[in-house]
């Protein structure tokens, strides 16, 4: 009994402190929210005072939704590497000196959300040329989403093969599998004797042609510089853009620097990252849920 009482009291103290932090910095009470993303989203709207235009055109919405593909959890095809340099006990001077380095991007989500982002005036364009789009600066007041066909020439395959740009959610075909993959598939039973298997869409970086690929104009400029060819443009969406989210991101970043305990350090990081997740939310999965103890309401709903 004493344990339960202590546990409840400690948790209540922690939650009350959490409420004080939120109300002090954001003027919002987390007790009114079901999740951290919904709290963070309202905090962002309150602090930035931004008015975001909603997309009402179904075709436009589907094109924008197609740009949400997920994230890769690997870079390159090498599964094993071994360093060999003068700082190692097992250094072999007769072999090539090399190093293994671990890279991590600081404030990855925060940096992305501090860039110019769409916020109003989304519309389909018919008079904007590809050259105009490719010559649009990153900080221009107008930005673009482009639906296009892409081709990766053979001469750039060697350069890009370890980390191909523009991954796609596609069904992998059996003929793409290596002999090793086929062997493992047969052993595990995922590939049957008649060489049929249950394919599910995967996020795959590849250097084959991309059809109807929807991409942000800054990424399009980047891959064009890598040597990727833009074969056809199907649709162009223009929008007004500015770094409207940067104020909120910078606020949390500064508060995290000033934090004197682990809770606040993690809290201000979460308040940034949770907003990113909220921008990726699939609202099509939402449902209206009613709780009632009234028979008439139950029949009505």
Regions of interest found by a model, annotated:
Residues 1-301:
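Conserved acidic
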